[in-house]
Regions:
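Segments of small-molecule ligand-sensing domains
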Residues: 309-318, 329-381
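Extracellular/periplasmic periplasmic-binding protein-like sensory domains
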Residues: 251-322, 382, 388
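Extracytoplasmic "Venus flytrap"
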Residues: 35-36, 40-64, 86-92, 115, ...
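An alpha-beta-alpha
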Residues: 150-211, 234
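Short, low-complexity disordered leader/linker segments with a strong preference
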Residues: 1-41, 72, 389-410
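Periplasmic-binding protein-like
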Residues: 102-114, 133-136, 178-181, 231-241, ...
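Extracellular/periplasmic bilobed ligand-binding domains
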Residues: 193-287
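Beta-alpha junction/loop-to-helix N-cap segments that form part of ligand/metal-binding clefts
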Residues: 26-33, 54-61, 73-144, 212-218, ...
């Protein structure tokens, strides 16, 4: 996928610079070296400013927390981890200059990009540097194509789209579905294509399909009216929270109360986008490998540590990044301390990581598969689908108390 044309590849190499995690520029070892005597340098790239900054900051924070924990526990083979993260502003071209800074700094292992577009650029550039990539959240299928030293911890889009259709069918949520997707975005279009193929195979009907582009993402009135008129009970919305917040704001009060809006990992952070009225996100279902309210001890410890450090609840972007750093640790240990891209890639298919997003093993294509669940948002609270949220439980209790008081007065 990445070797389409030499000029494109060179453009990617320039855009790839956004893979770093800090602002230091320091000359050091090249990506294929085993690092300095005392440190292993990790670099990552993502949007720390702009409309997608919530994703980049989550990834940065999740990675920082893992680095801190690993270093406090003695590091990796006696070496400390050092992390640098660079701002891509969500732009693939900007992402490339950052990768160059990281290489000058002496990056040994790359955590890739955050958004799919910048990730593809980073992965292409790293191919020429013997750089091992443990991609955090770039999910488009093509993101890691053409680079046999690139692996990822996140869901990939065709898996997500297929799993989304299966989830709706298996949980009896819909036989007829409406779809709204962004036709000029690889992430959204990839999810849409995989979802439709699996939905049709499982006997579901795509009753209505609507599209939008980056240029039309401010006015969803036509799409809302058309989807409402279709009478569907589920609308599949495979796009990012930034655009979803606009759509849901304009859709509020138009659909019946029992209609669900089902999305994938790009919806994470939706509550922050509708903080002026969190009920805008009511009935949003988001597929995820991570639930912050999980009772799993590993997840609970991660959530509490993240809250204590950043005064916020981690989302799956933070969780994926946290797991990515631990995956790097496992790979370096399996490779007897080497950070060579070839050495790390050679051991990756034999590595198993018990992470906060699930148990992960990797195939030769660099992909991992993890169990998927869904979070339901209601009254500003997200809970695993099928469980009552704390907000609903409190509301139900209050209603019961009020009803009891009314009966007593009567």
């Amino acid at each position: 996928m990445k070797k389409r044309v030499f000029a494109m590849l060179m453009a990617c190499v320039m855009a790839f610079s956004l893979v770093a995690c800090g602002s230091k520029t320091d000359s050091g070892t090249a990506g294929g070296d085993t690092g300095s005597a005392e440190t292993i340098k990790l670099g990552g790239v993502g949007p720390l400013t702009g409309g997608y900054a919530n994703y980049g900051l989550s990834v940065q924070h999740g990675a920082e927390l893992a680095v801190k924990e690993i270093n406090e526990a003695g590091g990796v083979g006696g070496k400390q981890l050092e992390l640098s993260f660079q701002d891509s502003q969500g732009d693939p071209e900007s992402a490339v200059a950052a990768y160059g800074k990281l290489m000058d700094w002496g990056m040994n292992v790359c955590l890739g990009g955050v958004l799919s577009g910048e990730t593809a650029s980073v992965v292409a550039a790293a191919n020429a540097d013997d750089m091992f990539i443990m991609e955090t959240t770039g999910s488009a299928d093509k993101c890691i194509d053409g680079n046999d030293k690139a692996f990822r911890v996140c869901f990939y889009d065709s898996y997500q789209g297929t799993a989304a259709a299966d989830y709706l069918k298996d949980n009896g949520l819909a036989d007829e579905v409406g779809v709204l997707y962004q036709s000029d975005n690889d992430y959204s279009a990839g999810l849409y294509n995989a979802f439709v193929a699996e939905a049709e195979k499982s006997g579901m009907t795509i009753k209505e399909t609507q599209t939008f582009t980056a240029a039309t993402a401010t006015d969803f009135s036509t799409q809302v009216n058309t989807l409402v008129a279709s009478g569907v009970k589920v609308v599949f919305i495979p796009f990012y929270a930034e655009e979803a917040s606009t759509f849901l704001t304009q859709a509020k009060g138009k659909f019946a109360d029992d209609v669900y809006f089902f999305g994938c990992d790009g919806l994470d952070g939706i509550l922050g986008k509708v903080s002026q009225d969190v009920t805008i996100a009511d009935n949003v279902l988001m597929m995820t490998p991570f639930a912050a309210d999980s009772t799993d001890p590993k997840v609970h410890a991660f959530v509490e540590a993240y809250k204590a450090t950043y005064n916020a609840t981690p989302d799956q972007f933070a969780a994926d990044a946290y797991d990515a750093v631990y995956a790097v640790k496992a790979a370096v240990e399996a490779a007897n301390g080497s950070t060579s891209g070839a050495d790390l890639a050679a051991v990756m298919t034999s590595v198993t990581v018990e992470g906060v997003t699930g148990t992960m093993t990797w195939n030769a294509d660099g992909n991992t598969s993890k169990a998927a669940s869904a979070i339901l948002y209601k009254n500003g609270v997200g809970t695993l689908f099928g469980q009552d949220s704390a907000a609903d439980t409190a509301a139900d209790a209050a209603e019961g108390t009020d009803a009891g008081a009314a009966d007593a007065q009567a």
